[in-house]
């Protein structure tokens, strides 16, 4: 089974610099954080979910820049829920991991860094197709 250790080393802590002017968190390009696309999510209606898919080859790094949300990851056999509520903590979603985002706070603003540009064929949007692909 691919990604058997789906839950190991998926949380990323970035340095946070605070002073009287506010806070700053920075991420610099390195092998772990190579990205081709960045997008943000906001104004999520109460009770809504996002995600509900897996990527064949794309990895993502998710952040709650403001507010909070929950992310459920599944490798087809095991599931784990992560609660993100800090702009300096990110969650890596590796390829071939089913991902569901939910429980968004009303003030949520999220940032996603993706390792590839948008490729519709790279998505698996059906749970059974995902399981059959493992």
Give the location of each predicted region.
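Structured catalytic cores of enzymes that bind and process phosphorylated ligands/cofactors
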Residues: 100-101, 108
């Amino acid at each position: 089974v691919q990604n058997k250790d789906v839950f190991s080393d998926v949380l990323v802590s970035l340095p946070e610099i605070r002073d009287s002017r506010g806070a700053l968190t920075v991420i610099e390009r390195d092998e772990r954080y190579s990205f081709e696309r960045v997008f943000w999510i906001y104004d999520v209606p109460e009770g809504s979910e996002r995600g509900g898919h897996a990527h064949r080859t794309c990895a993502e790094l998710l952040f709650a820049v403001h507010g909070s949300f929950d992310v459920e990851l599944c490798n087809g056999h095991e599931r784990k829920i992560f609660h993100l509520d800090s702009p300096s903590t990110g969650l890596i979603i590796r390829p071939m991991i089913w991902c569901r985002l939910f429980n968004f706070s009303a003030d949520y603003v999220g940032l996603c860094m993706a390792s590839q540009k948008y490729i519709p064929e790279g998505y698996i949007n059906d749970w059974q197709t995902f399981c059959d692909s493992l």
